[in-house]
Amino acid sequence: RQRVEELSKFSKKGAAARRRK
């Protein structure tokens, strides 16, 4: 369950970073 929460945060941060680029 902890990995899912980390993946969810990483996915949101990754999408924001990809949109900024």
From Swiss-Prot:
Residues 1-21 are annotated as: Disordered. It comes from the Eukaryota. GO terms for biological process: defense response to bacterium; defense response to fungus; killing of cells of another organism. Residues 10-21 have a biased composition (Basic residues). GO terms for cellular component: extracellular region. Its main location: secreted. The keyword Methyltransferase does not apply. Keywords: Antibiotic, Antimicrobial, Fungicide, Secreted. It is found in: Secreted. The keyword Secreted applies. Strong antimicrobial activity against several Gram-positive and Gram-negative bacteria and fungi. This is Misgurin. The lineage of its organism: Eukaryota, Metazoa, Chordata, Craniata, Vertebrata.
